[in-house]
Amino acid sequence: MSHISFKGCSFLSHLDSFQFDISSCQTIAASLVFATGGLFLLSRGLSFLRALFSIFILPGKSLSSFGPKGSWALVTGASDGIGKEYALQIARKGYNIILVSRSASKLSAVASEITSANPNILTKTVSMDFSENNDEDYEKLKDIIKDLDISILINNVGLSHSIPVPFVQTPEKEMKDIIAINCLGTLRVTQLVAPGMMQRKRGLILTMGSFGGLLPTPLLATYSGSKAFLQHWSTALASELEPYNIHVQLVVSYLVTSAMSKVRKASMTIPNPKAFVRSTLNHLGRSGGLFSYSHTSVPYWTHGLMAWGITSFLGAMSKTVLGINKSMHESIRQRALRKAARESGKKAQ
């Protein structure tokens, strides 16, 4: 009996030890979960502080660090909206301006506005339709700029869809125009300007990106793809030109009041061109809320916070973001189609 009792005690002893091991493992697992969660929250907290410092506190580089006053800035898509505002604000900082866009009359008006406000500033205008991708236009531009000290290039020219549209229904001309303007136009102008900057060992190249390139955007597939292309191209170019002391930066924006966005009223999340460009020029070299993307800036404060939140918690390429984007643009498309139907009905009457 005592022998049996001894074995029973031995079994109970092992059982207690086993239960203790399970309890210990559970405690360790819980500690690891809490530690991991704590590290995640700490990293996100530090990331948020970094974003706040970049957006609100740390100063950007001055334009004069990229080239002296009296040198030239070339701005594409300069006839109105963001491009016009870049030209006006850079001219006020003492740089001569080359205005490039399609409408000669609008370019002349912008040039007159610049010289009226800044009598010592020189301007040149180049009228060309980027959708044509015409070699003669680029040769003309090359001849005009060949002897100029261009220290700043603003790749602003761009085109989106007239309304959100499924890719298979996208008009062929619209599709080709978007690629010719957003991609080929930007590449060809940069290829004309960059060699001079490399010789002078200084310069600034800003290219307008978009949330549409950061986030895949259904019903704006061609536009979204063109802006995503610019994201990768600009970042790669930045690495190539960095040894020549040329700063290349993609500027990412959400909506800005403009003819292309079709938004007329400014709000906290949708600035007007003046406020957006001022923020961009004040944050040169700063990432805003998108520091996980090299050589990229989201300069306007609400856009920067939005970009930080999306990339930190949801993921720019996630199904959640994709679904939200799709629903939003499907709704915009339906409203646009209803508006077009109403206007067509009024004309028929």
From Swiss-Prot:
Keywords: Endoplasmic reticulum, Fatty acid biosynthesis, Fatty acid metabolism, Lipid biosynthesis, Lipid metabolism, Membrane, NADP, Oxidoreductase, Transmembrane, Transmembrane helix. One of its GO terms (biological process) is secondary metabolite biosynthetic process. It is a single-pass membrane protein. Its main location: endoplasmic reticulum. PROSITE patterns: ADH_SHORT. Its EC number is 1.1.1.330. The active site is at Y223, K227. The keyword Lipid metabolism applies. It comes from the Eukaryota. It is an enzyme of class 1 (oxidoreductase). The chain crosses the membrane at residues 29-49. One of its GO terms (cellular component) is endoplasmic reticulum membrane. It is found in: Endoplasmic reticulum membrane. It catalyses: a very-long-chain (3R)-3-hydroxyacyl-CoA + NADP(+) = a very-long-chain 3-oxoacyl-CoA + NADPH + H(+). The keyword Membrane applies. Pathway: Lipid metabolism; fatty acid biosynthesis. GO terms for molecular function: ketoreductase activity; very-long-chain 3-oxoacyl-CoA reductase activity. NADP(+) binds at L74, D129, D137, N156, Y223, K227, V256, S258. Disulfide bonds: none annotated. Component of the microsomal membrane bound fatty acid elongation system, which produces the 26-carbon very long-chain fatty acids (VLCFA) from palmitate. Catalyzes the reduction of the 3-ketoacyl-CoA intermediate that is formed in each cycle of fatty acid elongation. VLCFAs serve as precursors for ceramide and sphingolipids. Belongs to the short-chain dehydrogenases/reductases (SDR) family. This is Very-long-chain 3-oxoacyl-CoA reductase. It comes from Coccidioides immitis (strain RS).
